[in-house]
C-alpha cells in the first residue's frame, strides 16, 4: 500500500520492533513477519513532504546479535537524514 500524502511537515518515529527479527534481533518485542530493511528504505524514499525530525526507538543492545540492529538503526538514520536534507 502507499503512504498517505501529507501537506504539513513530517516527523518520523521509527520503532525497531517493527522490523522482522532477521534484520533487527536487538529489540525487546520481536515481530516475526515484520518489515525488511528494504521495505523501510522504500517507504522513507517515497515520502514527498518535508521531513523536519526523527527518532529511532525500541533498540535493546542486550538482545542485539553482533550489533546487527545497531548498524540497521544507523543505516535507517542515514536514510532519514538524507530525506531531511532534500529541499
Q: Where do the PLM segments sit?
A:
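Catalytic cores of soluble, metal-dependent hydrolases
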Residues: 1-87
Amino acid at each position: 500500500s502507499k503512504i498517505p500524502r501529507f501537506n504539513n511537515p513530517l516527523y518520523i518515529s521509527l520503532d525497531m520492533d517493527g522490523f522482522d527479527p532477521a534484520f533487527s534481533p536487538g529489540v525487546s518485542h520481536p515481530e516475526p513477519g515484520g518489515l525488511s530493511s528494504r521495505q523501510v528504505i522504500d517507504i522513507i524514499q517515497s515520502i514527498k513532504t518535508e521531513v523536519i525530525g526523527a527518532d529511532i526507538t525500541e533498540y535493546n543492545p542486550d538482545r542485539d546479535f553482533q550489533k546487527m540492529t545497531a548498524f540497521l538503526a544507523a543505516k535507517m538514520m542515514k536514510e532519514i537524514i538524507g530525506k531531511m536534507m532534500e529541499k
